[in-house]
């Protein structure tokens, strides 16, 4: 079902559970869903858009610390880390996800890409957001949350970010 079918409003999030939200989802289905998200990120030029913003903000002589919340297979974080490294940035990239299988896929993705990104398990809705990052992102995740959870998470992200 199209999540916007009834409302016709592209600004309204669909809070319905997705296949990937099932903790009992079979491994091959979960990996297939992660590959699908990677395709979405590729087609929508997610890394390119984030990179453009980081290049506006960042100083190539400075260290950039990036945190990707609900990182899934880590494709956005790894691509961003590699693109910044190629441009001379020193990058510390860290991704968090609640799913051990997604984290395993993210680590493998980083290894294959020659990325120094690291990953850890975290329930970003209920857990403590790691501090000490300059740039915090979350791609294709917030639509899962209620308005109240989004506001709470964004506030906790702002509190954890190094601002300067």
Indicate residue ranges for each PLM-predicted region.
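N-terminal auxiliary segments of SAM/dcSAM-dependent transferases
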Residues: 1-23
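Class I SAM-dependent methyltransferase Rossmann-like catalytic core
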Residues: 23, 27-53, 57
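Short helix-loop-beta connector
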Residues: 58-65
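Class I SAM-dependent methyltransferase SAM/SAH-binding core
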Residues: 67, 73-76, 80-126
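A conserved beta-strand element that flanks and buttresses the S-adenosyl-L-methionine
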Residues: 137
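Hydrophobic adenine-recognition pocket in adenosine-nucleotide-binding enzymes
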Residues: 141
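A short, conserved alpha-helix within the catalytic core of class I
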Residues: 145-156
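Conserved beta-strand signature within the Rossmann-like core of class I S-adenosyl-L-methionine
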Residues: 161-164
